[in-house]
A protein has these predicted regions:
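Intrinsically disordered, low-complexity segments enriched in small/polar residues
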Residues: 32-34, 66, 110-112, 116
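Mid-chain, well-packed structural core segment of small domains
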Residues: 64-90
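Short C-terminal domain-edge/linker segments immediately following a structured domain
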Residues: 55, 67-75, 94-100
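Residue-level recognition of well-ordered beta-strand positions that form the cores
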Residues: 40, 64-68, 117-121
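Short secondary-structure junctions
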Residues: 14-20, 89-96
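Small/polar-rich, solvent-exposed N-terminal microdomains that initiate assembly or binding
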Residues: 1-52, 73, 80
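Short, charged interaction patches at domain edges and termini
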Residues: 1-10, 44-52, 56-60, 96-130
């Protein structure tokens, strides 16, 4: 059994950020509006030790979220979005934030780009461990 909570998490973030930012999955090269948030899962592997005749009990899951903002308040806007996202993924769901950093946006340096990665072990009942 594959445990996959990425659609659920994306839907929750979409609802949370609805009036504040455009959120997309997958990334668009030229978004029409800012702030712009992308969501992608980068890991969904079985935990081998948890497999028995009933199937896999635990899955390693990872998400990457990128925040793009523009304008005079771009840094503040990105940090506000980061806080909301972190409260949802770390606070509410229990995922471990493994990366949280500003990344240069090579295509357009007027765009502030911030990357956050979360990881966790999810059981067959969708409970998160880290």
């Amino acid at each position: 059994m594959i445990v996959d909570v990425s659609n659920q998490i994306f839907s929750e973030l979409f609802t949370l950020l609805d009036r504040m930012a455009t959120i997309s999955r997958p990334n668009q090269d030229n978004p029409l509006e800012y702030p712009y948030v992308t969501f992608d899962d980068f890991d969904n592997g079985d935990i081998a030790d948890s497999k028995d005749t009933g199937g896999v009990k635990y899955t390693s899951i990872g998400f990457e979220i990128q925040i793009y903002t523009k304008g005079d308040t771009r840094m503040t806007d990105a940090k506000e979005l980061r806080l909301l996202i972190d409260e949802k993924l770390s606070g509410e769901h229990g995922f471990l934030r493994t990366t949280s950093q500003k990344i240069p946006n090579l295509r357009d340096d007027s765009i502030y780009r911030y990357v956050i990665r979360y990881e966790g072990i999810v059981d067959e009942n969708e409970k998160v461990y880290n």
